Amino acid sequence: MIHEIFPVGMLGCNCSVIGDESTQEALVIDPGDEIERVLKLLQQHQLKLKQIIVTHAHIDHVGGAMKLKWATGAPILLNKEDYGLLKMLDIQAAWIGAPPPGADEIDQSIEDQDTIQCGTITGTVMHTPGHTEGSTCIYFPSEQKLIAGDTLFAGSIGRTDLPGGSFNKIITSLNDRVLALPDETVVVPGHGPLTTIGEERQSNPFLVKR
């Protein structure tokens, strides 16, 4: 599996380009900005973009999705519980002093337990509300990788003080869903360095059992 991870935009959102070497199909997860870099990587690996997946509708994760759709024709997938946040993109842009990206057009809602297929690569959607109502993670069992969006970080968790956030919900999502994964699972958070489920289970102050 090809997996390129790189920070984009003023808030350093971790964007993932995932490709199947046998079929040359690709996914892009959280294209928040710098779409030229995404397109360059797709071209470099000779990949055809099949789907654009957004873990949640905060501008730093979804801000470049429409531009990527225009460039490639690939559909945008996002959980429907975050559609309301999409209508606030101009407001979100003002929060961080960024230019408004314009409206995003979502092609399909991704739901809990949906299968994401990219050639021979299979991912499973996990609905993990808390950071936002529609926050999702994508788990790739054969690769033991979790694209966590802003649900889990190395040593921390997603903030819950923005519209749609709930501390109780994110803790439930983490305890019931995310920590059910094997300790060896590599976590690709929405920002910052990679970690593992085992490391977070042992040392994350929000998750350590007292």
Positions of predicted regions on the chain:
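Active-site HxH/HxHxD metal-binding segment of metal-dependent hydrolases
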Residues: 33-117, 202-206
